Amino acid sequence: MAKGQSLQDPFLNALRRERIPVSIYLVNGIKLQGQIESFDQFVILLKNTVNQMVYKHAISTVVPARPVSHHSGDRPASDRPAEKSEE
């Protein structure tokens, strides 16, 4: 798994699992809204009145309608508190 996926996948999976409504802003400024039905390495399937397959390279920002619960196991090591070193 690529390093960039270590934060992206747990975040998108939490949005999908908890059925949190999202606003997805594309690089051209268009705003899409719905719930994440599914995703893979390249696309997100967004469900609203219709299903839309959105290519990740076209996405600028994903904004959840409410806070997403984070589990410590989902956080990459770079986001965990640093261990104190003995000096």
From Swiss-Prot:
Instruction: Give the CC-aspect GO terms.
Output: cytosol
Coiled-coil blocks: none
One Pfam family per UniProt: Hfq
Q: Which GO terms describe its molecular function?
A: RNA binding
Q: Which GO terms describe its biological process?
A: regulation of DNA-templated transcription; regulation of RNA stability; regulation of translation, ncRNA-mediated
Q: CDD domains, alphabetically?
A: Hfq
The name on file for this protein is RNA-binding protein Hfq
- What is the organism field in this record? Vibrio cholerae serotype O1 (strain ATCC 39315 / El Tor Inaba N16961)
